[in-house]
Structure formats: structure tokens, C-alpha cells
Amino acid sequence: MSQLTHINAAGEAHMVDVSGKAETVREARAEAYVEMQATTLAMIIDGSHHKGDVFATARIAGIQAAKRTWELIPLCHPLMLSKVEVNLQAQPEHNRVRIESLCRLTGKTGVEMEALTAASVAALTIYDMCKAVQKDMVIGPVRLLAKSGGKSGDFKVGECHD
């Protein structure tokens, strides 16, 4: 079983030392959903929401959040991301918005937290912009879809990993 890398031998939280690691291309994808009433989703789709373009705002928020993950998650390293992508898709058949984020860099540590943060903050931004018309929206699930690069190997949802 894998060890918790952010806990030292004394059981204390610490930042992992990545100075000895090789730089490799690392990438991660994550997703989040925001469930809402059909009327709320229709306002987003047709652009009639009084706060403006919900998807554009959520996309920018997700990108900004990925770049600032190290300020939000205590033991994350500040990273020089080379790519952050946030895509939003209305799914009227399910009364929800699907958000998928992608983060990439060449570096010594992974970008899973950055991808998860991007998707999460984009979802929170949708909630913030739409809460005046609906307060009972549901955010989730939020999950890592895939990661590649690094010592721990690749991961993809649905593949068995021990």
C-alpha cells in the first residue's frame, strides 16, 4: 500500500521535497458537475442571465484557480503551468453543466490538484453567478479523470490500480 507522502515519520504534515526528482511532462484531467433546474440551465444557454456570460466567467475562474492552487492547498508546490484548459458543456438532458479541466507542465511534481481545483472553482463560479435564481443547485461529483507522468505512473478512471 502507498504511503501518505505529506506525512513524515513523526506523523506531522510536511511539504514533499521534490528537488531530487527528474523533470517530466505531467498532465492531469478532472471533471465536475453542477446540477440545476432546467430553467436555470436555459438562462445560461440562451445568454439571458443578468450577470453575463456564465461559461466565460467560470472558464476564467477555473484557469485562475489552477494557477493559484498552491495558495489554496497548504502543501502544494507553486508550479509553472504550461497549459490550463477548462471546458464547459451544458447537458440539458440531465439538467446540468459538465466541466472538464486539463493542466500540463514539465516539472518535478504532478498537476492533479491544479486540475481538480480548476474544475471545482469553475463549478463554484457557476453556483455564485446563478444563486440569485436558484439556491439548491448541487455541485458534484468532482473527480480526477486521468494523470500521466511522474514516478507513480499513469492513472485513468476505470482502470484498476493497486
Curated annotation (Swiss-Prot):
Pfam families: MoaC (PF01967). One of its GO terms (biological process) is Mo-molybdopterin cofactor biosynthetic process. Coiled coil: none annotated. Substrate binds at L75, C76, H77, M113, E114. The active site is at D128. Its EC number is 4.6.1.17. Catalyzes the conversion of (8S)-3',8-cyclo-7,8-dihydroguanosine 5'-triphosphate to cyclic pyranopterin monophosphate (cPMP). This is Cyclic pyranopterin monophosphate synthase. It comes from Klebsiella pneumoniae subsp. pneumoniae (strain ATCC 700721 / MGH 78578). The lineage of its organism: Bacteria, Pseudomonadati, Pseudomonadota, Gammaproteobacteria, Enterobacterales.
